[in-house]
Amino acid sequence: MEKQWWKESVVYQIYPRSFMDSNGDGIGDLRGIISKLDYLKELGIDVIWLSPVYESPNDDNGYDISDYCKIMNEFGTMEDWDELLHEMHERNMKLMMDLVVNHTSDEHNWFIESRKSKDNKYRDYYIWRPGKEGKEPNNWGAAFSGSAWQYDEMTDEYYLHLFSKKQPDLNWDNEKVRQDVYEMMKFWLEKGIDGFRMDVINFISKEEGLPTVETEEEGYVSGHKHFMNGPNIHKYLHEMNEEVLSHYDIMTVGEMPGVTTEEAKLYTGEERKELQMVFQFEHMDLDSGEGGKWDVKPCSLLTLKENLTKWQKALEHTGWNSLYWNNHDQPRVVSRFGNDGMYRIESAKMLATVLHMMKGTPYIYQGEEIGMTNVRFESIDEYRDIETLNMYKEKVMERGEDIEKVMQSIYIKGRDNARTPMQWDDQNHAGFTTGEPWITVNPNYKEINVKQAIQNKDSIFYYYKKLIELRKNNEIVVYGSYDLILENNPSIFAYVRTYGVEKLLVIANFTAEECIFELPEDISYSEVELLIHNYDVENGPIENITLRPYEAMVFKLK
């Protein structure tokens, strides 16, 4: 396996709207990020993934782009962005931009032109179809509820939008679209960026004919089998690599809902020349029932272990894993798989240990390193996320479902859990802004904030810093093989990493109860060294350990 800088890096995702506001308008901005770079350097971050900062009407918080080569006014200017890149490079940090090219905003110039007439030169930049018998061209539903088709009076046709109606899908089968996208990518790469995270990139190739989904169900249904990992996806990614990516020393990760391990090998195998990593979602769907995301069910540790292990083993020799618990679309991990009450600190450290000792490139989401939690707003009016608001409208207003039950599912799964402002200190609005924040700060900011974390040497922040240092100083963490042990233990997640004669033993209690770890007999060693631990502990025998609630430890064995 080839050694690469992006395999050895730790990435930190910034959601700019909620990170730091420099001018008091209640919205995080680029100058706010610049002011916090030293904090991220102290943590040990190598790469910052910046969620979209391009010009946008903000229907989906910047994932609806109206100009790919301009900066959104709320975030600052291109000069601010240039300064951010310069300041990051001065600190030996790299910048990965968000590439959102499955769709644009309906306010993008391409779409404004495309709507005008059927023979406009931009018409085929998007996917237009006549209706069928007075209805939509097919029965596909949109991710944010309703139909995936929007009728447009101007030309008496419908356009496809897999997300909101203000996010029309680009027609990637049109070579001009692809070339314009590649030119835009080169614009940013020539400015000196170090990579792209690609939004729902496995949606860009739609099945020819856009077939109706065969189903007994009434209404709109997911058409994912007709656009996820579609017929030309590898052709287009290979072309993108050949024409753009391969000419720069950069890192790439493709967000790919529904991707399997076998498909991931095709996307990330080095000899295939497509992408370096994918974001897969299987471990993020384990607490969803048959009704999808909002149908919340408990996730057993056995299932979680089995799933993460499957990905570790599948990409052991081909491709590369991305490691994450959190991002801007997911609830907070300490509330989801940990214990955000009595054992918040212990369980946040335990979850970090399990993830960061695996093979792959770890991604930390803002606030994760201080153990930020989910939020419980009393009223739907305090929520801002289009997905949450549309779901509430559909379930409560249109179907009359129980408000309490719907709010409960929002508390557990809503995307705004990740989007409340970063908690910097215990001052007003957690030090995020001097104005009124665009979304309310989580009320627990007085107990959970960066200032307090930096003053306490036993904080979650310093634990993350130490995990990152372990990765930097031990090649085994980056390149060692992975093997699950105690696979049928319902309470303990334990695995072994091996690199030459070295071994790492990682042990984690996923419960609020004590439990006993027994070392499997086939693990032999002559020396043992404790590398990191989330309780006070002495070096001792490892054959039989009573683990306290959410206890985690890593040993080096020789």
Swiss-Prot record:
Ca(2+) binds at D21, N23, D25, D29. The keyword RNA-binding does not apply. One of its GO terms (biological process) is oligosaccharide catabolic process. Its EC number is 3.2.1.10. GO terms for cellular component: cytoplasm. Keywords: Calcium, Cytoplasm, Glycosidase, Hydrolase, Metal-binding. It catalyses: Hydrolysis of (1->6)-alpha-D-glucosidic linkages in some oligosaccharides produced from starch and glycogen by alpha-amylase, and in isomaltose. It is found in: Cytoplasm. Belongs to the glycosyl hydrolase 13 family. This is Oligo-1,6-glucosidase. It comes from Bacillus cereus. The gene is malL.
